[in-house]
Amino acid sequence: MKIGVFVPIGNNGWLISTHAPQYMPTFELNKAIVQKAEHYHFDFALSMIKLRGFGGKTEFWDHNLESFTLMAGLAAVTSRIQIYATAATLTLPPAIVARMAATIDSISGGRFGVNLVTGWQKPEYEQMGIWPGDDYFSRRYDYLTEYVQVLRDLWGTGKSDFKGDFFTMNDCRVSPQPSVPMKVICAGQSDAGMAFSAQYADFNFCFGKGVNTPTAFAPTAARMKQAAEQTGRDVGSYVLFMVIADETDDAARTKWEHYKAGADEEALSWLTEQSQKDTRSGTDTNVRQMADPTSAVNINMGTLVGSYASVARMLDEVASVPGAEGVLLTFDDFLSGIETFGERIQPLMQCRAHLPTLTQEVA
């Protein structure tokens, strides 16, 4: 099973709590995180894009770096780990994304890929005067379908004459082209999102579910597997989890309860309000899960709370789910969390037993 890190491009990572570590996003922090992840044989690093935060006492995600420029910098200071940036497709023409991706492919030596997002938080785009209207909620995957076709044209042939409802290319050119086929990823959880991923993505991200219920996402992975069967493509699921680990189960649970007790209710109210704006995409979208009050303090990603052995066991359970090809991990404290994962958790995981130990590497 592949392991990736969801780097904290926004302040405070993924804990909306006054009791969680409070920090600003910087290149130096993310460089240290990704270099440490590479040291411990993580397979990939992904950054999101966020253009407006949730406010509140913690000013949650009010402070964000930009994804492509951050990942270009990280590509230059790493050598093995796969690097993914996120394109907010309403803000960037596909021909520009195609050229930026080809540039980072050159920087990284073929280790770069692109995560495509349609955009769900209306104020992010309205503040710039580029929100296309609420009808977009029901047409966003039509838009993304045209977008990715332009990308594939330009990366594959260096030229596009695509004509659609949203984009018109007139002998559009991009050169040099990427040195290897460019991987495209998506995070579709609605039926429309999964249909898109089944047709165009190399793999699809989905949320884990619940606390210490590592296989609860299995129905989502099964839906993705079924959608991919309809297109005859192999599109696996990569599952988002937060790891909160300590020497014992009780110590880890104490940390988790402490974070929950400090939940930033003002920021969480903003998230809930925004999640209700899209009335056209159905009830199974990512944002609806994010705003669920069950565990909104960490945006309702699957949460693995326990001793190092318990977390290793739960991750092995994730790997046993049909269609689950990888996990995307966040941590309450990224630098210490990745080190602890590499030293204490990963060596206990059966699904990572193929990796050399750090002692073997030094020898």
From Swiss-Prot:
KW Transport (keyword) present: no
Catalytic activity, reaction form: uracil + FMNH2 + NADH + O2 = (Z)-3-ureidoacrylate + FMN + NAD(+) + H2O + H(+); thymine + FMNH2 + NADH + O2 = (Z)-2-methylureidoacrylate + FMN + NAD(+) + H2O + H(+)
Assigned EC number: 1.14.99.46
First-level EC class: oxidoreductase
UniProt xrefs under InterPro entries: Luciferase-like_dom, Luciferase-like_sf, Pyrimidine_monooxygenase_RutA, SsuD_RutA_monooxygenase
CDD domains xrefs: Alkanesulfonate_monoxygenase
Induction (free text): Up-regulated by the nitrogen regulatory protein C (NtrC also called GlnG) and repressed by RutR.
Disulfide-bonded cysteines: none
UniProt cross-references to Gene3D superfamilies, sorted A to Z: Luciferase-like domain (3.20.20.30)
Superkingdom to which the source organism belongs: Bacteria
Keywords for the protein's UniProt record, in alphabetical order: Flavoprotein, FMN, Monooxygenase, NADP, Oxidoreductase
GO-annotated molecular function: alkanesulfonate monooxygenase activity; uracil oxygenase activity
Example GO BP: uracil catabolic process
Binding site for FMN: 49-50, 115, 124, 140-141, 190
Family statement: Belongs to the NtaA/SnaA/DszA monooxygenase family. RutA subfamily.
NCBIfam families: RutA
Function: The FMN-N(5)-oxide reacts spontaneously with NADH to produce FMN. Requires the flavin reductase RutF to regenerate FMN in vivo.
Name of the featured protein: Pyrimidine monooxygenase RutA
